[in-house]
Protein backbone atom coordinates (compact mmCIF):
# COMPACT_ATOMS: atom_id res chain seq x y z
CA UNK A 1 0.00 0.00 0.00
CA UNK A 2 1.17 3.52 -0.77
CA UNK A 3 0.05 6.78 0.80
CA UNK A 4 -0.12 10.35 -0.40
CA UNK A 5 -0.57 13.21 2.06
CA UNK A 6 -1.22 16.90 1.66
CA UNK A 7 -0.79 18.61 5.02
CA UNK A 8 -2.09 21.96 3.78
CA UNK A 9 -5.46 20.46 2.82
CA UNK A 10 -5.33 17.73 5.48
CA UNK A 11 -5.80 15.12 2.74
CA UNK A 12 -4.70 11.51 3.10
CA UNK A 13 -4.92 9.04 0.22
CA UNK A 14 -4.21 5.33 0.62
CA UNK A 15 -3.77 3.31 -2.59
CA UNK A 16 -3.36 -0.43 -2.96
CA UNK A 17 -2.58 -2.36 -6.13
CA UNK A 18 -5.01 -5.29 -6.36
CA UNK A 19 -3.95 -6.88 -9.65
CA UNK A 20 -1.55 -6.47 -12.55
CA UNK A 21 -4.33 -5.61 -15.03
CA UNK A 22 -3.73 -3.06 -13.41
CA UNK A 23 -6.48 -2.43 -10.86
CA UNK A 24 -6.19 -0.31 -7.72
CA UNK A 25 -8.25 0.67 -4.70
CA UNK A 26 -8.12 4.08 -3.06
CA UNK A 27 -9.41 5.40 0.26
CA UNK A 28 -9.60 9.19 0.20
CA UNK A 29 -9.83 11.27 3.38
CA UNK A 30 -10.04 15.04 3.67
CA UNK A 31 -11.39 18.10 1.88
CA UNK A 32 -10.61 18.01 -1.85
CA UNK A 33 -12.23 21.44 -2.42
CA UNK A 34 -15.14 20.02 -4.41
CA UNK A 35 -17.66 22.34 -2.74
CA UNK A 36 -15.45 25.28 -3.67
CA UNK A 37 -15.44 24.00 -7.25
CA UNK A 38 -19.26 23.86 -7.29
CA UNK A 39 -19.41 27.52 -6.28
CA UNK A 40 -16.88 28.62 -8.87
CA UNK A 41 -17.40 26.18 -11.74
CA UNK A 42 -15.32 25.99 -14.93
CA UNK A 43 -16.04 26.95 -18.53
CA UNK A 44 -13.40 24.86 -20.30
CA UNK A 45 -10.97 22.03 -19.70
CA UNK A 46 -8.20 24.58 -19.27
CA UNK A 47 -10.28 26.44 -16.68
CA UNK A 48 -11.05 23.19 -14.85
CA UNK A 49 -7.39 22.13 -14.80
CA UNK A 50 -6.39 25.60 -13.60
CA UNK A 51 -8.75 25.22 -10.64
CA UNK A 52 -7.32 21.78 -9.81
CA UNK A 53 -3.79 23.13 -10.11
CA UNK A 54 -4.53 26.02 -7.77
CA UNK A 55 -6.74 24.26 -5.24
CA UNK A 56 -5.06 20.86 -5.04
CA UNK A 57 -2.05 20.07 -7.18
CA UNK A 58 -0.29 23.43 -7.28
CA UNK A 59 1.71 22.31 -10.31
CA UNK A 60 1.14 23.37 -13.95
CA UNK A 61 0.55 21.28 -17.06
CA UNK A 62 -1.48 18.30 -15.95
CA UNK A 63 -3.28 17.09 -19.08
CA UNK A 64 -6.39 14.96 -19.02
CA UNK A 65 -6.38 12.00 -21.38
CA UNK A 66 -8.39 12.31 -24.61
CA UNK A 67 -10.35 9.08 -24.40
CA UNK A 68 -13.65 8.46 -26.12
CA UNK A 69 -15.83 5.76 -24.64
CA UNK A 70 -18.94 3.85 -25.61
CA UNK A 71 -20.77 2.07 -22.84
CA UNK A 72 -23.99 0.36 -21.87
CA UNK A 73 -25.97 0.30 -18.63
CA UNK A 74 -29.20 -1.12 -17.27
CA UNK A 75 -31.31 -1.29 -14.13
CA UNK A 76 -33.18 -4.46 -13.13
CA UNK A 77 -33.98 -6.60 -10.07
CA UNK A 78 -32.88 -9.96 -8.77
CA UNK A 79 -35.18 -12.68 -7.45
CA UNK A 80 -35.08 -11.12 -3.97
CA UNK A 81 -36.22 -7.80 -5.47
CA UNK A 82 -32.86 -6.20 -4.80
CA UNK A 83 -32.28 -3.34 -7.24
CA UNK A 84 -29.34 -3.95 -9.58
CA UNK A 85 -27.51 -1.21 -11.46
CA UNK A 86 -25.18 -2.61 -14.13
CA UNK A 87 -22.76 -0.93 -16.51
CA UNK A 88 -20.00 -1.62 -19.03
CA UNK A 89 -17.11 0.79 -19.38
CA UNK A 90 -15.80 0.43 -22.93
CA UNK A 91 -13.02 2.78 -23.98
CA UNK A 92 -9.62 2.87 -25.63
CA UNK A 93 -7.56 2.91 -22.44
CA UNK A 94 -8.31 2.56 -18.75
CA UNK A 95 -6.54 2.26 -15.43
CA UNK A 96 -9.41 1.44 -13.06
CA UNK A 97 -9.43 2.68 -9.48
CA UNK A 98 -12.00 1.61 -6.88
CA UNK A 99 -12.51 4.78 -4.84
CA UNK A 100 -13.96 5.01 -1.33
CA UNK A 101 -15.01 8.25 0.34
CA UNK A 102 -15.84 7.83 4.02
CA UNK A 103 -15.73 11.20 5.72
CA UNK A 104 -17.83 14.19 6.69
CA UNK A 105 -17.30 16.12 3.44
CA UNK A 106 -19.86 14.10 1.46
CA UNK A 107 -22.16 11.12 1.59
CA UNK A 108 -20.13 7.94 1.81
CA UNK A 109 -19.71 6.45 -1.63
CA UNK A 110 -18.02 3.69 -3.58
CA UNK A 111 -17.11 4.37 -7.20
CA UNK A 112 -14.94 3.41 -10.16
CA UNK A 113 -12.63 6.01 -11.67
CA UNK A 114 -10.62 5.71 -14.88
CA UNK A 115 -7.23 7.03 -13.84
CA UNK A 116 -6.13 7.19 -17.48
CA UNK A 117 -8.40 10.25 -17.69
CA UNK A 118 -6.19 11.76 -14.99
CA UNK A 119 -2.91 11.14 -16.81
CA UNK A 120 -1.94 8.04 -14.84
CA UNK A 121 0.07 5.31 -16.50
CA UNK A 122 1.24 1.94 -15.18
CA UNK A 123 4.31 3.48 -13.52
CA UNK A 124 2.48 6.17 -11.53
CA UNK A 125 1.75 3.91 -8.56
CA UNK A 126 5.47 3.24 -8.06
CA UNK A 127 6.39 6.93 -8.20
CA UNK A 128 3.41 8.29 -6.31
CA UNK A 129 5.25 10.58 -3.90
CA UNK A 130 7.33 12.27 -6.59
CA UNK A 131 4.73 12.16 -9.36
CA UNK A 132 1.32 13.22 -8.00
CA UNK A 133 -0.13 14.17 -11.38
CA UNK A 134 -3.88 14.55 -10.79
CA UNK A 135 -4.16 11.87 -8.09
CA UNK A 136 -5.44 14.42 -5.58
CA UNK A 137 -8.36 15.12 -7.94
CA UNK A 138 -9.37 11.46 -8.29
CA UNK A 139 -12.68 11.91 -6.48
CA UNK A 140 -13.83 14.66 -8.87
CA UNK A 141 -14.68 12.35 -11.77
CA UNK A 142 -16.19 8.93 -10.96
CA UNK A 143 -17.36 7.03 -14.04
CA UNK A 144 -19.97 5.19 -11.97
CA UNK A 145 -20.73 4.70 -8.30
CA UNK A 146 -23.13 4.21 -5.40
CA UNK A 147 -23.59 6.22 -2.22
CA UNK A 148 -24.74 5.32 1.29
CA UNK A 149 -28.41 5.84 0.38
CA UNK A 150 -28.31 3.32 -2.46
CA UNK A 151 -28.31 6.00 -5.15
CA UNK A 152 -26.21 5.15 -8.23
CA UNK A 153 -25.05 6.98 -11.35
CA UNK A 154 -23.08 6.15 -14.50
CA UNK A 155 -21.79 8.24 -17.40
CA UNK A 156 -22.20 7.20 -21.04
CA UNK A 157 -21.27 8.97 -24.26
CA UNK A 158 -24.11 10.61 -26.20
CA UNK A 159 -22.57 12.38 -29.19
CA UNK A 160 -25.83 14.18 -30.05
CA UNK A 161 -26.18 15.89 -26.67
CA UNK A 162 -26.15 19.69 -26.51
CA UNK A 163 -25.71 21.16 -23.05
CA UNK A 164 -27.62 24.14 -21.63
CA UNK A 165 -25.82 27.48 -21.47
CA UNK A 166 -27.82 29.84 -19.27
CA UNK A 167 -26.22 33.02 -18.01
CA UNK A 168 -27.60 32.67 -14.49
CA UNK A 169 -26.10 29.20 -13.90
CA UNK A 170 -22.62 28.02 -12.95
CA UNK A 171 -20.92 25.79 -15.53
CA UNK A 172 -19.31 22.45 -14.61
CA UNK A 173 -17.14 19.93 -16.45
CA UNK A 174 -19.60 17.16 -17.39
CA UNK A 175 -17.30 14.44 -16.00
CA UNK A 176 -17.76 15.91 -12.50
CA UNK A 177 -21.57 15.62 -12.35
CA UNK A 178 -21.47 12.04 -10.97
CA UNK A 179 -19.44 13.28 -8.00
CA UNK A 180 -21.99 16.04 -7.35
CA UNK A 181 -24.82 13.50 -7.39
CA UNK A 182 -23.01 10.95 -5.22
CA UNK A 183 -22.31 13.75 -2.74
CA UNK A 184 -25.84 15.10 -2.53
CA UNK A 185 -28.56 12.89 -4.08
CA UNK A 186 -30.51 10.26 -2.16
CA UNK A 187 -32.95 9.55 -4.98
CA UNK A 188 -33.58 9.88 -8.70
CA UNK A 189 -35.74 12.95 -8.09
CA UNK A 190 -33.00 14.67 -6.14
CA UNK A 191 -30.49 13.80 -8.88
CA UNK A 192 -32.72 15.43 -11.50
CA UNK A 193 -33.08 18.51 -9.29
CA UNK A 194 -29.33 18.92 -8.79
CA UNK A 195 -28.50 18.27 -12.44
CA UNK A 196 -30.75 21.06 -13.71
CA UNK A 197 -29.04 23.63 -11.49
CA UNK A 198 -25.95 23.86 -13.73
CA UNK A 199 -24.62 24.34 -17.24
CA UNK A 200 -22.04 21.87 -18.52
CA UNK A 201 -19.16 21.66 -20.95
CA UNK A 202 -17.42 18.62 -22.42
CA UNK A 203 -13.93 17.88 -23.66
CA UNK A 204 -13.99 14.93 -26.09
CA UNK A 205 -17.67 14.00 -26.40
CA UNK A 206 -20.85 14.95 -24.50
CA UNK A 207 -22.56 12.58 -22.10
CA UNK A 208 -25.86 11.36 -20.80
CA UNK A 209 -26.36 9.83 -17.37
CA UNK A 210 -28.21 6.83 -15.99
CA UNK A 211 -29.38 7.24 -12.39
CA UNK A 212 -31.22 4.86 -10.08
CA UNK A 213 -32.08 4.54 -6.41
CA UNK A 214 -32.76 1.85 -3.84
CA UNK A 215 -36.54 2.23 -4.23
CA UNK A 216 -36.27 0.93 -7.80
CA UNK A 217 -36.76 4.21 -9.63
CA UNK A 218 -34.46 4.91 -12.55
CA UNK A 219 -34.06 7.50 -15.29
CA UNK A 220 -31.74 8.63 -18.06
CA UNK A 221 -30.84 12.32 -17.90
CA UNK A 222 -30.04 13.82 -21.31
CA UNK A 223 -29.56 17.17 -23.01
CA UNK A 224 -31.45 17.94 -26.22
CA UNK A 225 -31.38 21.33 -27.98
CA UNK A 226 -29.74 22.89 -24.96
CA UNK A 227 -32.35 21.64 -22.49
CA UNK A 228 -32.24 18.91 -19.88
CA UNK A 229 -34.71 16.09 -20.57
CA UNK A 230 -35.50 12.96 -18.59
CA UNK A 231 -36.55 9.50 -19.76
CA UNK A 232 -37.97 7.44 -16.91
CA UNK A 233 -38.28 3.68 -16.78
CA UNK A 234 -41.52 2.36 -18.28
CA UNK A 235 -41.00 -1.11 -16.81
CA UNK A 236 -39.17 -2.58 -13.84
CA UNK A 237 -36.03 -2.33 -15.93
CA UNK A 238 -34.36 0.27 -18.13
CA UNK A 239 -31.49 0.23 -20.64
CA UNK A 240 -29.23 2.88 -22.13
CA UNK A 241 -26.23 2.81 -24.47
CA UNK A 242 -24.81 5.62 -26.60
CA UNK A 243 -27.70 7.30 -28.39
CA UNK A 244 -30.28 9.77 -27.15
CA UNK A 245 -33.37 8.00 -25.77
CA UNK A 246 -35.59 11.06 -25.55
CA UNK A 247 -38.00 11.51 -28.49
CA UNK A 248 -36.34 8.61 -30.33
CA UNK A 249 -39.04 5.93 -30.65
CA UNK A 250 -37.04 3.86 -33.15
CA UNK A 251 -34.04 3.91 -30.78
CA UNK A 252 -31.71 4.78 -33.65
CA UNK A 253 -28.05 5.54 -33.06
CA UNK A 254 -24.69 4.17 -31.99
CA UNK A 255 -25.17 1.21 -29.66
CA UNK A 256 -28.63 0.27 -30.99
CA UNK A 257 -27.55 -3.38 -31.27
CA UNK A 258 -26.32 -3.51 -27.67
CA UNK A 259 -29.43 -1.69 -26.49
CA UNK A 260 -31.76 -4.16 -28.19
CA UNK A 261 -29.78 -7.19 -27.03
CA UNK A 262 -29.92 -6.13 -23.39
CA UNK A 263 -33.55 -4.97 -23.58
CA UNK A 264 -34.68 -8.24 -25.17
CA UNK A 265 -32.77 -10.32 -22.64
CA UNK A 266 -34.32 -8.45 -19.72
CA UNK A 267 -37.76 -8.57 -21.32
CA UNK A 268 -37.63 -12.36 -21.61
CA UNK A 269 -36.95 -12.55 -17.87
CA UNK A 270 -39.42 -9.79 -16.96
CA UNK A 271 -36.57 -7.73 -15.60
CA UNK A 272 -35.49 -10.36 -13.07
CA UNK A 273 -31.81 -11.24 -13.26
CA UNK A 274 -29.12 -12.44 -10.86
CA UNK A 275 -25.89 -10.54 -10.36
CA UNK A 276 -23.99 -13.33 -12.12
CA UNK A 277 -26.40 -13.18 -15.06
CA UNK A 278 -26.10 -9.39 -15.12
CA UNK A 279 -22.32 -9.65 -15.45
CA UNK A 280 -22.73 -12.22 -18.22
CA UNK A 281 -25.21 -9.96 -20.03
CA UNK A 282 -22.78 -7.08 -19.80
CA UNK A 283 -19.91 -9.23 -21.06
CA UNK A 284 -21.89 -10.30 -24.12
CA UNK A 285 -22.63 -6.68 -25.06
CA UNK A 286 -19.27 -4.94 -25.00
CA UNK A 287 -17.57 -3.05 -27.81
CA UNK A 288 -14.96 -5.64 -28.90
CA UNK A 289 -11.44 -4.51 -28.13
CA UNK A 290 -12.57 -1.65 -25.89
CA UNK A 291 -13.92 -3.60 -22.92
CA UNK A 292 -12.43 -2.30 -19.65
CA UNK A 293 -14.79 -3.18 -16.80
CA UNK A 294 -18.24 -4.58 -16.14
CA UNK A 295 -19.81 -3.56 -12.84
CA UNK A 296 -22.99 -4.58 -11.04
CA UNK A 297 -24.07 -2.48 -8.07
CA UNK A 298 -26.67 -3.90 -5.68
CA UNK A 299 -28.49 -0.77 -4.55
CA UNK A 300 -30.34 -2.63 -1.82
CA UNK A 301 -27.31 -4.24 -0.19
CA UNK A 302 -24.91 -1.47 -1.33
CA UNK A 303 -22.38 -3.82 -2.86
CA UNK A 304 -20.32 -3.88 -6.04
CA UNK A 305 -19.26 -6.84 -8.19
CA UNK A 306 -16.82 -5.97 -10.97
CA UNK A 307 -14.73 -7.74 -13.60
CA UNK A 308 -11.97 -6.32 -15.78
CA UNK A 309 -10.98 -6.83 -19.42
CA UNK A 310 -13.65 -9.48 -19.91
CA UNK A 311 -12.12 -11.74 -17.25
CA UNK A 312 -15.31 -13.16 -15.77
CA UNK A 313 -13.39 -15.80 -13.81
CA UNK A 314 -12.16 -13.14 -11.37
CA UNK A 315 -15.03 -11.18 -9.86
CA UNK A 316 -13.95 -8.52 -7.36
CA UNK A 317 -16.55 -7.79 -4.69
CA UNK A 318 -16.82 -4.77 -2.42
CA UNK A 319 -19.19 -3.55 0.30
CA UNK A 320 -19.86 0.14 0.92
Give residue spans per PLM region.
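A surface/extracellular/periplasmic glyco- and lipid-processing/surface-interacting theme
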Residues: 153-154, 160-283, 288-291
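N-terminal mature-domain region immediately after signal-peptide cleavage
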Residues: 1-184, 272-320
Amino acid sequence: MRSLRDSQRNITIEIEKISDHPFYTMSYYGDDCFEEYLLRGAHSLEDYCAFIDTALVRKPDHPICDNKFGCGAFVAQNADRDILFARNMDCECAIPMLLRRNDTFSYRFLSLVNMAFLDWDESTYDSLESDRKLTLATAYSPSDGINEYGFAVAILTDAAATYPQQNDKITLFDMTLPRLLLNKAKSVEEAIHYTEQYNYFYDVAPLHYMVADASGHSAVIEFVDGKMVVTRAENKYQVVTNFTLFDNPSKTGFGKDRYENILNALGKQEGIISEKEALELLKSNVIPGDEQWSAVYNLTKKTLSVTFLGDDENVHRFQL
